[in-house]
Amino acid sequence: MAPTSTFPVINMELLAGEERPAAMEQLDDACENWGFFEILNHGISTELMDEVEKMTKDHYKRVREQRFLEFASKTLKEGCDDVNKAEKLDWESTFFVRHLPESNIADIPDLDDDYRRLMKRFAAELETLAERLLDLLCENLGLEKGYLTKAFRGPAGAPTFGTKVSSYPPCPRPDLVKGLRAHTDAGGIILLFQDDSVGGLQLLKDGEWVDVPPMRHSIVVNLGDQLEVITNGRYKSVMHRVVAQTDGNRMSIASFYNPGSDAVISPAPALVKEEEAVVAYPKFVFEDYMKLYVRHKFEAKEPRFEAFKSMETETSNRIAIA
Protein backbone atom coordinates (compact mmCIF):
# COMPACT_ATOMS: atom_id res chain seq x y z
CA MET A 1 0.00 0.00 0.00
CA ALA A 2 1.25 3.49 -0.85
CA PRO A 3 2.36 5.78 1.99
CA THR A 4 -0.06 8.39 3.32
CA SER A 5 2.51 11.04 4.29
CA THR A 6 1.92 13.07 1.13
CA PHE A 7 -1.87 13.04 1.37
CA PRO A 8 -2.85 16.71 0.94
CA VAL A 9 -3.87 18.47 4.14
CA ILE A 10 -4.79 22.14 3.74
CA ASN A 11 -4.89 24.65 6.58
CA MET A 12 -7.62 27.07 5.55
CA GLU A 13 -6.38 29.72 7.97
CA LEU A 14 -3.51 30.27 5.54
CA LEU A 15 -5.96 31.56 2.94
CA ALA A 16 -6.36 34.76 4.93
CA GLY A 17 -2.69 35.74 5.07
CA GLU A 18 0.55 36.05 3.18
CA GLU A 19 0.66 32.30 2.57
CA ARG A 20 -2.57 32.36 0.55
CA PRO A 21 -0.85 31.85 -2.86
CA ALA A 22 0.92 28.71 -1.59
CA ALA A 23 -2.28 27.38 0.00
CA MET A 24 -4.24 28.00 -3.20
CA GLU A 25 -1.55 26.19 -5.19
CA GLN A 26 -1.75 23.27 -2.76
CA LEU A 27 -5.54 23.19 -3.20
CA ASP A 28 -5.22 23.22 -6.98
CA ASP A 29 -2.68 20.40 -6.91
CA ALA A 30 -4.92 18.33 -4.62
CA CYS A 31 -7.88 18.75 -6.98
CA GLU A 32 -5.82 17.94 -10.07
CA ASN A 33 -3.75 15.04 -8.78
CA TRP A 34 -5.70 13.53 -5.89
CA GLY A 35 -9.40 14.39 -6.16
CA PHE A 36 -9.26 14.26 -2.35
CA PHE A 37 -7.89 16.49 0.38
CA GLU A 38 -8.33 17.17 4.07
CA ILE A 39 -8.99 20.64 5.49
CA LEU A 40 -8.21 22.07 8.92
CA ASN A 41 -9.44 25.32 10.49
CA HIS A 42 -12.43 25.26 8.16
CA GLY A 43 -14.71 27.43 10.28
CA ILE A 44 -16.98 24.77 11.80
CA SER A 45 -16.64 24.83 15.57
CA THR A 46 -15.00 21.86 17.26
CA GLU A 47 -17.75 21.96 19.90
CA LEU A 48 -20.41 21.43 17.23
CA MET A 49 -18.42 18.60 15.66
CA ASP A 50 -17.95 16.90 19.04
CA GLU A 51 -21.67 17.14 19.73
CA VAL A 52 -22.54 15.72 16.31
CA GLU A 53 -20.13 12.82 16.83
CA LYS A 54 -21.50 12.02 20.29
CA MET A 55 -25.15 12.12 19.27
CA THR A 56 -24.52 10.14 16.07
CA LYS A 57 -22.76 7.37 17.97
CA ASP A 58 -25.44 7.40 20.67
CA HIS A 59 -28.14 7.14 18.00
CA TYR A 60 -26.46 4.13 16.40
CA LYS A 61 -26.08 2.38 19.75
CA ARG A 62 -29.67 3.08 20.79
CA VAL A 63 -31.52 2.55 17.51
CA ARG A 64 -29.46 0.81 14.86
CA GLU A 65 -26.98 -1.55 16.48
CA GLN A 66 -29.39 -4.44 17.06
CA ARG A 67 -30.82 -4.11 13.55
CA PHE A 68 -27.32 -4.22 12.13
CA LEU A 69 -26.32 -7.27 14.16
CA GLU A 70 -29.30 -9.13 12.71
CA PHE A 71 -28.32 -8.00 9.20
CA ALA A 72 -24.68 -8.93 9.83
CA SER A 73 -25.50 -12.46 10.89
CA LYS A 74 -27.52 -13.01 7.71
CA THR A 75 -24.88 -11.28 5.56
CA LEU A 76 -22.03 -13.45 6.80
CA LYS A 77 -24.03 -16.63 6.33
CA GLU A 78 -24.95 -15.65 2.76
CA GLY A 79 -21.37 -14.60 2.06
CA CYS A 80 -19.95 -17.88 3.26
CA ASP A 81 -22.44 -19.74 1.09
CA ASP A 82 -21.94 -17.56 -1.99
CA VAL A 83 -18.71 -15.57 -2.42
CA ASN A 84 -20.07 -13.76 -5.50
CA LYS A 85 -23.00 -12.50 -3.45
CA ALA A 86 -20.66 -11.35 -0.67
CA GLU A 87 -18.73 -9.21 -3.14
CA LYS A 88 -21.90 -7.18 -3.74
CA LEU A 89 -22.59 -6.46 -0.07
CA ASP A 90 -21.51 -3.47 2.03
CA TRP A 91 -20.79 -3.76 5.76
CA GLU A 92 -22.46 -0.51 6.81
CA SER A 93 -25.47 0.84 8.65
CA THR A 94 -26.79 4.05 7.07
CA PHE A 95 -29.54 6.60 6.89
CA PHE A 96 -29.85 9.59 4.57
CA VAL A 97 -31.04 13.11 5.36
CA ARG A 98 -32.09 15.44 2.55
CA HIS A 99 -31.58 19.17 3.22
CA LEU A 100 -32.19 20.81 -0.18
CA PRO A 101 -34.29 21.50 -2.11
CA GLU A 102 -36.64 20.42 0.70
CA SER A 103 -35.64 18.88 4.02
CA ASN A 104 -36.97 15.46 5.01
CA ILE A 105 -35.38 15.35 8.45
CA ALA A 106 -38.76 15.66 10.19
CA ASP A 107 -39.92 12.49 8.41
CA ILE A 108 -37.03 10.22 9.41
CA PRO A 109 -38.15 7.84 12.14
CA ASP A 110 -36.25 7.16 15.36
CA LEU A 111 -34.42 10.51 15.48
CA ASP A 112 -34.96 12.47 18.67
CA ASP A 113 -35.69 16.18 18.37
CA ASP A 114 -32.33 17.31 19.77
CA TYR A 115 -30.52 15.23 17.15
CA ARG A 116 -32.72 16.65 14.36
CA ARG A 117 -31.97 20.22 15.44
CA LEU A 118 -28.27 19.47 15.74
CA MET A 119 -28.06 17.92 12.26
CA LYS A 120 -29.85 20.94 10.77
CA ARG A 121 -27.27 23.25 12.37
CA PHE A 122 -24.41 21.10 11.13
CA ALA A 123 -25.88 20.93 7.61
CA ALA A 124 -26.16 24.73 7.43
CA GLU A 125 -22.46 25.05 8.33
CA LEU A 126 -21.49 22.45 5.74
CA GLU A 127 -23.56 24.12 3.03
CA THR A 128 -21.71 27.39 3.64
CA LEU A 129 -18.36 25.59 3.61
CA ALA A 130 -19.18 23.74 0.38
CA GLU A 131 -20.02 27.00 -1.39
CA ARG A 132 -16.87 28.63 -0.05
CA LEU A 133 -14.78 25.75 -1.40
CA LEU A 134 -16.50 25.91 -4.79
CA ASP A 135 -15.61 29.60 -5.04
CA LEU A 136 -11.98 28.77 -4.22
CA LEU A 137 -12.04 26.21 -7.02
CA CYS A 138 -13.45 28.87 -9.36
CA GLU A 139 -10.56 31.14 -8.46
CA ASN A 140 -8.00 28.46 -9.25
CA LEU A 141 -9.76 27.54 -12.49
CA GLY A 142 -9.99 31.12 -13.71
CA LEU A 143 -13.80 31.05 -13.62
CA GLU A 144 -15.88 33.94 -12.37
CA LYS A 145 -16.80 33.79 -8.69
CA GLY A 146 -20.02 31.84 -8.21
CA TYR A 147 -19.80 30.00 -11.55
CA LEU A 148 -19.90 26.53 -9.98
CA THR A 149 -22.69 27.24 -7.49
CA LYS A 150 -24.71 28.84 -10.30
CA ALA A 151 -24.14 25.80 -12.53
CA PHE A 152 -25.32 23.55 -9.70
CA ARG A 153 -28.51 25.52 -9.06
CA GLY A 154 -30.16 24.86 -12.42
CA PRO A 155 -33.45 26.40 -13.61
CA ALA A 156 -35.21 25.71 -10.29
CA GLY A 157 -32.55 27.71 -8.46
CA ALA A 158 -31.48 25.17 -5.85
CA PRO A 159 -28.77 22.53 -5.56
CA THR A 160 -29.37 19.07 -4.17
CA PHE A 161 -27.82 18.74 -0.73
CA GLY A 162 -28.00 15.78 1.62
CA THR A 163 -26.11 13.84 4.25
CA LYS A 164 -25.41 10.12 4.48
CA VAL A 165 -24.80 9.04 8.07
CA SER A 166 -22.96 5.72 8.27
CA SER A 167 -21.57 3.38 10.87
CA TYR A 168 -19.08 0.66 9.98
CA PRO A 169 -19.12 -1.79 12.92
CA PRO A 170 -16.38 -4.37 13.53
CA CYS A 171 -16.43 -7.08 10.89
CA PRO A 172 -15.26 -10.61 11.75
CA ARG A 173 -14.68 -11.44 8.07
CA PRO A 174 -13.13 -8.42 6.27
CA ASP A 175 -11.80 -10.89 3.72
CA LEU A 176 -15.39 -11.59 2.72
CA VAL A 177 -17.06 -8.17 2.48
CA LYS A 178 -16.10 -4.53 2.02
CA GLY A 179 -17.27 -1.74 4.29
CA LEU A 180 -18.26 0.05 1.08
CA ARG A 181 -17.31 -1.09 -2.41
CA ALA A 182 -15.10 1.03 -4.69
CA HIS A 183 -16.85 3.83 -6.58
CA THR A 184 -16.64 7.45 -7.61
CA ASP A 185 -19.26 9.87 -6.30
CA ALA A 186 -21.81 11.00 -8.85
CA GLY A 187 -22.32 14.54 -7.66
CA GLY A 188 -20.41 17.73 -7.01
CA ILE A 189 -18.36 18.29 -3.87
CA ILE A 190 -18.48 15.97 -0.88
CA LEU A 191 -17.62 16.98 2.69
CA LEU A 192 -16.89 14.13 5.09
CA PHE A 193 -16.70 14.27 8.87
CA GLN A 194 -15.11 10.92 9.67
CA ASP A 195 -14.09 9.05 12.77
CA ASP A 196 -10.68 10.16 14.02
CA SER A 197 -9.78 6.87 15.69
CA VAL A 198 -11.01 4.16 13.29
CA GLY A 199 -9.71 4.25 9.72
CA GLY A 200 -10.77 2.37 6.61
CA LEU A 201 -11.35 5.00 3.92
CA GLN A 202 -9.02 4.56 0.95
CA LEU A 203 -8.66 6.23 -2.45
CA LEU A 204 -7.12 4.84 -5.62
CA LYS A 205 -4.06 6.81 -6.76
CA ASP A 206 -1.64 5.70 -9.46
CA GLY A 207 -2.98 2.16 -9.26
CA GLU A 208 -2.54 1.81 -5.49
CA TRP A 209 -4.96 2.13 -2.60
CA VAL A 210 -3.98 4.98 -0.28
CA ASP A 211 -5.32 5.45 3.25
CA VAL A 212 -7.12 8.70 4.00
CA PRO A 213 -5.69 9.54 7.43
CA PRO A 214 -8.18 10.10 10.25
CA MET A 215 -7.55 13.53 11.81
CA ARG A 216 -9.50 15.06 14.67
CA HIS A 217 -11.83 17.92 13.70
CA SER A 218 -10.83 17.81 10.04
CA ILE A 219 -13.17 17.65 7.06
CA VAL A 220 -12.25 15.34 4.18
CA VAL A 221 -13.23 16.75 0.79
CA ASN A 222 -13.56 14.83 -2.45
CA LEU A 223 -14.73 15.78 -5.91
CA GLY A 224 -17.57 14.07 -7.73
CA ASP A 225 -18.18 13.24 -11.38
CA GLN A 226 -19.98 16.54 -12.06
CA LEU A 227 -16.93 18.62 -11.19
CA GLU A 228 -14.83 16.49 -13.52
CA VAL A 229 -17.27 17.26 -16.33
CA ILE A 230 -17.57 21.00 -15.60
CA THR A 231 -13.78 21.41 -15.32
CA ASN A 232 -13.35 19.48 -18.59
CA GLY A 233 -11.18 16.91 -16.84
CA ARG A 234 -8.77 19.30 -15.15
CA TYR A 235 -10.10 18.12 -11.80
CA LYS A 236 -11.00 14.45 -11.40
CA SER A 237 -13.36 12.32 -9.38
CA VAL A 238 -11.49 9.39 -7.86
CA MET A 239 -12.35 5.81 -6.99
CA HIS A 240 -12.55 5.25 -3.23
CA ARG A 241 -13.75 2.56 -0.86
CA VAL A 242 -14.12 1.68 2.81
CA VAL A 243 -12.26 -1.39 4.06
CA ALA A 244 -14.05 -3.30 6.80
CA GLN A 245 -12.16 -3.40 10.09
CA THR A 246 -12.03 -6.12 12.73
CA ASP A 247 -11.85 -3.57 15.56
CA GLY A 248 -13.70 -0.35 16.24
CA ASN A 249 -16.93 1.17 14.94
CA ARG A 250 -16.14 3.81 12.30
CA MET A 251 -18.42 6.83 12.05
CA SER A 252 -18.85 8.58 8.70
CA ILE A 253 -21.00 11.65 8.01
CA ALA A 254 -20.76 12.49 4.31
CA SER A 255 -22.57 15.57 2.99
CA PHE A 256 -23.12 15.80 -0.76
CA TYR A 257 -23.47 19.24 -2.35
CA ASN A 258 -24.75 18.27 -5.79
CA PRO A 259 -26.41 19.93 -8.77
CA GLY A 260 -30.17 20.33 -8.73
CA SER A 261 -32.01 17.54 -10.51
CA ASP A 262 -32.84 19.87 -13.43
CA ALA A 263 -29.34 21.36 -13.74
CA VAL A 264 -27.76 21.01 -17.18
CA ILE A 265 -24.14 19.94 -16.74
CA SER A 266 -21.43 20.47 -19.35
CA PRO A 267 -17.81 21.64 -19.52
CA ALA A 268 -17.36 25.32 -18.70
CA PRO A 269 -16.71 27.06 -22.06
CA ALA A 270 -13.72 28.89 -20.56
CA LEU A 271 -12.06 25.52 -19.89
CA VAL A 272 -12.57 24.07 -23.37
CA LYS A 273 -9.69 24.82 -25.73
CA GLU A 274 -10.66 25.94 -29.21
CA GLU A 275 -8.33 23.40 -30.78
CA GLU A 276 -10.06 20.45 -29.10
CA ALA A 277 -11.35 18.47 -32.05
CA VAL A 278 -13.21 15.92 -29.93
CA VAL A 279 -15.42 16.88 -27.01
CA ALA A 280 -14.02 15.10 -23.97
CA TYR A 281 -17.13 15.30 -21.80
CA PRO A 282 -20.85 15.25 -22.57
CA LYS A 283 -23.72 17.59 -21.79
CA PHE A 284 -26.62 16.16 -19.79
CA VAL A 285 -29.26 16.82 -17.16
CA PHE A 286 -28.08 15.79 -13.70
CA GLU A 287 -31.22 13.76 -12.98
CA ASP A 288 -30.58 11.68 -16.11
CA TYR A 289 -27.00 11.05 -15.01
CA MET A 290 -28.22 9.85 -11.61
CA LYS A 291 -30.61 7.38 -13.21
CA LEU A 292 -27.66 5.80 -15.00
CA TYR A 293 -25.37 6.07 -11.98
CA VAL A 294 -27.60 4.11 -9.60
CA ARG A 295 -27.42 1.13 -11.95
CA HIS A 296 -23.65 1.33 -12.41
CA LYS A 297 -22.34 2.98 -9.21
CA PHE A 298 -19.71 0.35 -8.49
CA GLU A 299 -18.27 0.44 -11.99
CA ALA A 300 -15.84 2.77 -13.78
CA LYS A 301 -17.13 6.27 -14.52
CA GLU A 302 -15.85 6.46 -18.11
CA PRO A 303 -18.60 4.28 -19.64
CA ARG A 304 -21.18 6.57 -18.02
CA PHE A 305 -19.63 9.59 -19.71
CA GLU A 306 -19.39 7.74 -23.01
CA ALA A 307 -23.05 6.72 -22.83
CA PHE A 308 -24.12 10.36 -22.68
CA LYS A 309 -21.70 11.34 -25.43
CA SER A 310 -23.30 8.68 -27.63
CA MET A 311 -26.75 10.06 -26.82
CA GLU A 312 -25.56 13.55 -27.80
CA THR A 313 -24.23 12.25 -31.12
CA GLU A 314 -27.47 10.43 -31.90
CA THR A 315 -29.51 13.53 -31.10
CA SER A 316 -27.28 15.72 -33.28
CA ASN A 317 -27.54 13.25 -36.16
CA ARG A 318 -31.34 13.18 -35.92
CA ILE A 319 -31.45 16.99 -35.98
CA ALA A 320 -29.12 17.10 -39.00
CA ILE A 321 -31.25 14.58 -40.91
CA ALA A 322 -34.44 16.47 -40.11
UniProtKB/Swiss-Prot annotation:
Its cofactor is Fe cation. Keywords: Ethylene biosynthesis, Fruit ripening, Iron, Metal-binding, Oxidoreductase, Vitamin C. GO terms for molecular function: 1-aminocyclopropane-1-carboxylate oxidase activity; L-ascorbic acid binding; metal ion binding. Pathway: Alkene biosynthesis; ethylene biosynthesis via S-adenosyl-L-methionine; ethylene from S-adenosyl-L-methionine: step 2/2. Residues 159-259 form the Fe2OG dioxygenase domain. Induction: By flooding. SUPFAM superfamilies: Clavaminate synthase-like (SSF51197). Its EC number is 1.14.17.4. It is an enzyme of class 1 (oxidoreductase). The keyword Metal-binding applies. Fe cation binds at H183, D185, H240. Belongs to the iron/ascorbate-dependent oxidoreductase family. This is 1-aminocyclopropane-1-carboxylate oxidase 1. It comes from Oryza sativa subsp. indica. The lineage of its organism: Eukaryota, Viridiplantae, Streptophyta, Embryophyta, Tracheophyta. The gene is ACO1.
